[in-house]
Amino acid sequence: MRCRAIISLLIPVLLAGCGKGPVSEPSSRELTVFIGTDGYGDGSYNDTMLYGILGFCKDHPDVNLSLQQPENIADAGKRLDAWLSEEGSGDRALILASNTYEEILRGKSAPKNGRVLILETDDVFPGHSSYIIRRYGASWLSGAMSRYFVGIIFKAMDGNDMIEESARGFSNGHSAVSDQKVYTWTLANGPEGFAMRDSTYRYVYKKTEEFYESEEFFGDLLFFPLLGGSLPGLFDYCRYNGFIHIAGMDVDCTAFNPLVVPYSLCVNNHLALKMYLEDWLSGKPWPEHMEFGLESEYVQVVPNRQFSFENQDMAALHEEYYSRAVEKEKEYAAE
């Protein structure tokens, strides 16, 4: 998959650039990052986050970077306790780059000489910082732009707040402008659903066969994937089936296939992280909590201008429904 391959190739290059060059004395700035337990290289959430962090470190070689991938939540908890208890003399920052780490941060006291940021959570952690990039507006817009398709919301699991918000946004946007149906599939019962590439392929193969045989089915399919690291399994299946379409997710995947991907919902965590890290370097305190939505630069829906299925103009649909999606997101936030 091209969108995955590009980022996967860039990460080692950026990583090689961090920490290189002559250093006369140890840096007093230390940046530690716990990436998600599903790692990187899937072309989605973790990759965009990691790309931003490595780019920042390349621009600021005086910052010492410790990039860690805990084996599981329990391992992450031990690493967090060790970091919080360190008696370092420099300026330290820790980024918990997944909302699956909420449980290990909750109730922890602030470190004496550092700061902690956890990504993609709407919870507040006293003494620490958090932010969330809201997907409701972008998902509503995606649903409206999918008006000519039968929609399938494909979730990695049930009960994840960010996934449920996106699913609700897509469903509401689609139903507001379309007579086609929206279905929901769920891959797994827990977080393991975010790292099941092979199982995703088999699941979709079986479900679509059943779907096409259903008497109630009529129309062209479009997947709205909320799968994390399992997303490549869906792309693997769609690569060989020209009658199924898929929304790009997290990064711009429109180059995957102009006949398959009508648009991409892009989450620009690298831009949000750059803002936080630059504030850290300048000594500016981090807010306790921040939220960003469709009107910010941190989430956007990118139309595939090459998409030519039945002469659908994704750019025109984006322009038609964008303002309405912004208003719907504000209404949702006020609920």
Predicted regions: what they are:
Residues 15-17:
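C-terminal motif of bacterial Sec signal peptides marking the signal peptidase cleavage site
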Residues 109-134, 251-258:
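Flexible loop/hinge segments that line or gate small-molecule binding clefts
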Residues 275-335:
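Hinge/cleft segment of the Venus flytrap/periplasmic-binding protein
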Residues 19-21:
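Bacterial signal peptide processing site
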Residues 31-52, 56, 60, 67-73, ...:
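Extracytoplasmic "Venus flytrap"
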Residues 130-152, 265-283:
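Hydrophobic alpha-helical segments within soluble ligand-binding/sensing domains
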Residues 33-34, 88-99, 119, 216-228, ...:
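Periplasmic-binding protein-like
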Residues 53, 138-187, 287-310:
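An alpha-beta-alpha
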